[in-house]
Amino acid sequence: MSTWHRGRDIVTANRVEKEGSLADFVEQVHSSKLVRVPGTAVFPHPNKESAPLALRANVEHNGVLHQHVVIFSAVPKTVPHVAKDDQVSVDNLGYADDGIVHVTLRYGFFDRPNIPYALARHGDEVSAELGGAELSDVSYFLSRATLRPRRTGSMRRWRKALFVAMARNAANPAAYFGLPADRTVVMGTQIDL
């Protein structure tokens, strides 16, 4: 267990460094002349402090951003079910007209954090913040980190190998969040361990 926790701490620290601040990213997007393409893109991400790697990669590699962007965080609660009125909150991240929002889904331990279902159930709230965006046909973008064990670092070699093996066996985020395979794009990056 200590190998898993230590490895996750290292990976999380490296990811946060690569991701950078979400507020800075939104400011950069707002002040730049990025080409905006039609449609809605949803980026599952654990928090609203840092920018999803898939969002950064999409902008850096393709030079475009969808007209409507939803950064979606699922937060587990210590109750069996969360009431519908308390499940979703939407934040425009500082600019009401840039088409970028952060959605927080709170769910209980008997609930499944199904993102398409949550968007369908709370679509009016999200669509209103996005200026009337169509949420029935969205694209989902996942960040996938490939771990690269290095000779240097704060973990012994055998612990790195064990952590990499455990990470490969971790749950598939697309299945966990109920994302449709035909509308999900996985964008990868490499993280040193």
Predicted features and spans:
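Alpha-helical membrane-embedded segments
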Residues: 1-6
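Cytosolic C-terminal regulatory domains/tails of membrane transporters and channels
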Residues: 8-193
